């Protein structure tokens, strides 16, 4: 039957100049085309009707190694017979990429005219997941899989699976309160407790009562599943754990300059020649910029035999994504290249590389808190929560010999850190939320079923 050239990543309104995950982030080989030799029986992709490419089968083997994969049958059965399903899993177990795909399979089989929407707390996470899932499903970004973030949309009427921020879905409810276009709604990172996600949790309970065929899937970190089950009338729970348990190494004392201590430790790890990428959790985005500059300056002073340090800044609140490095630089570098991912404590969803072996945690983070007395936001730098520290450790769940370096003593974890991060609805200015509830004809906060009262 000859040879078919299948071009699978067709970007519509997506602009590679503005949004581009570098090849060294996703571990791909950079091939733009897959060549498939046709035999007598070709397996067709049910989402676009085209034969699967050979890359699809390679990625399928990687997907089957994810910890979440063994729960697929249990999840599909729970989704078929329950309106709400809760999935509690460690970080990097694959729930954010695989669960929405399974929901799309459910809609294709049970509700063919309905789509799936999956919310993300961070804009870069929504775009990055859409790129990765479109690749795994062997479909075109902007057609069968798309994304919608503030001021940018890459979707079409044929889109079956859409990633978006929680604020985008909240605004969509203003025009269509019952969300009739969707058969399954997936709320990811519920444990982040953003204002938009909290509002969606309360409002979607009324939507579920009006639409018996609608399904709601909640993805959360392990520390919050009990709270969600109590809020959702004992909905079925699926629990997923990482493959490996990382070793935590604590500092003897609290560092007066945790930023400089983190950079010193980073260089020490690089000098050990142990393989693996490094994630550094810093206090604020200004520290990310400084660390990026200092690592690039120090690069010229390092022994070339150690290999190259590649800092990759990941900003949770910024609109741009990681720029693609020049291809000629990638090809010319033959020595070992170690990636250093720089982010803040809330940037954990942006870290999804598979080769992370070391994590450095400064133990503090900055967050914005609204002060009603002065009617202004204040930026506070405080110790992170115990649940957040555990999530930093879970990033190493796929590494058999991963280590978490905590730049604080172990007693600091139990004495100075709170058990959980407070809900944003209790610390943020709620003017926009009040206007949203008024638009939805809801009298006030008491009539919206929040997990935590504002």
Labelled PLM ranges:
Residues 1-454:
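P-loop NTPase motor module signature
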